[in-house]
Amino acid sequence: MLAYAADLRLRWQRWACREPLSGVLDTMRKAEVVSEQASIFPRASGVLLHPTSLPGPYGIGDLGAWAYRFVDCLAAAGQSVWQVLPLGPTGFGESPYQALSTFAGNTNLISLDGLVADGWLSAEELAERPYFSPRKCDYAAAIAFRDEMLSLAYDRFVRDSEAVAACEAWCRHPDRWWLDDFALFMALKEYHGGRPWVDWTESEVFREKQALGAARNMHATRIAEHRFRQWVFFRQWDALRAYANSKGIRIVGDIPIYVAHDSADVWVNPELFDLDFYGRPNFIAGVPPDYFSATGQRWGNPLYLWEEHQRTGYAWWIQRVRATLQVVDIVRIDHFRGFDLYYKIPAERPTAQGGRWVNGPKIGFFRALSAGLGRELDQLPIIAEDLGDDLGAAIALRDSLHLPGMAILQFAFSSYEGEENRFLPHNHVPNMVVYTGTHDNNTVWGWWTNESSPGEREHLRRYVGKDRIDEPNWELIQMGMASPAHTFIVPLQDMLGLGASARMNKPGVPAGQWRWRCLPDDLPQNISGTPWERLAALTRAHGRAQG
């Protein structure tokens, strides 16, 4: 009744001012959208940390006890968001953004201790592991050890009739329509020594029915083991997510707009991608020169044939987003601008220079996605990664969908003209997600000491009213917490005050990335006297604490 009376007063005031009724309706609709968005994005804060960066004794962070400890730290500090990078199986270079499948999970994240609890491994077997650095992921050695342990666990699993029945039931579910092709893809890739699918036999490249049938028979045991590994991954992930949700913490996942060429997705669906007769890309994805790279970024991903996607009603994309939203609560779409315009680089070019911008599917894609997911267009649980230059049309597309964009505080001080820099806190808007930096940025301390210009440092000092900046990471955290944006995310490295050696990724540098790990002491049982307590105080002070 109160809301109805308020609406009547609003209508009368507009009428008295002779504003057209359409203006009244627009105002009311905007208010409804704000209310609907608030239910998806309440005022909140959280931490960015990929599971590989967790502590643990097996060379790579995983979904075991330390992941639960991290959730406990988030809850104790009043946080309500855990943001992760893509969770798919990684290939060469271990980049989460170059997964072997957009539907499968990264089985390197399986908790081996969890398999001890299942009775498929022993503590004594895990105790015979090699030495692993606690500070950096040793992917080659860790994956070799994990592969051995997972195969050993599988050999025991097949004698556990109750578990076998549960696994088979999971595999038969209609949502696992992708699983058999993925398991075959992995078995063939292993058989061919890890070579890309375009280098397999011609009959396998072209997916001839007889060849695939023979391969399924020849590699039946390995295919079954890959099905088992996927079941274990999703069983462990679902349990971890349920625990996080029970603590009031939502998980933000990540969808790269493009998929890796050497992936089950492209092998199974070549008609959806811009490939030549032999399955190799005609053009590849990337971006022109920008802040991150003087020669641009040449990602190597094949481009979509958007006309074919449109012809199918964007069915593959709808399946992709639906599958992601079954394992996370909110999803960030990386390189959102690609739905408006995408950068097309001839495959033979060695760098991203010489490409051109081409129209993407625009709002038609999102209308189809909305219908396919059964959600209103302005209620999609999506964060638009809208970074880059010359984004006018992409920003308009984002705003028409009422999606939150992003602001990076490290980028806020590159100009003294505050009104020209949308990343400065006083230019933030409520429907936005603010970060000190992302996985592609240096840490705040690394930026402050190694990358920021004298002008940027002076601008930050003037902005906060200090002659000297002793803790640039906490200055930016304070800004993010105080922002009018509904969500603020801080990478764990910035909360811990770590330098450039803790950087997760440097775009354009293919080797040595994605390796940083936090230490056990960084995730204390009692947050008193730690950076977590300081984060908690700021969270409460700025109205972001949950519970």
Language-model segments: which ranges?
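Conserved, well-ordered alpha-helix/loop/beta-strand core segments that scaffold catalytic motifs
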Residues: 226-258
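Catalytic domains of carbohydrate-active enzymes, especially glycoside hydrolases
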Residues: 66-87
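Tryptophan (W) side chains
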Residues: 12-15
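Structured C-terminal cap/extension of enzyme domains
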Residues: 497-547
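Short, acidic/polar
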Residues: 62-72, 314-323
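Alpha-amylase-like alpha-glycosidases and glucanotransferases acting on alpha-linked glucans and related
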Residues: 35-43, 48-50, 93-234, 259-489, ...
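Mature N-terminal, pre-catalytic/accessory segment of carbohydrate-active enzymes
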Residues: 25-53, 57-65, 77
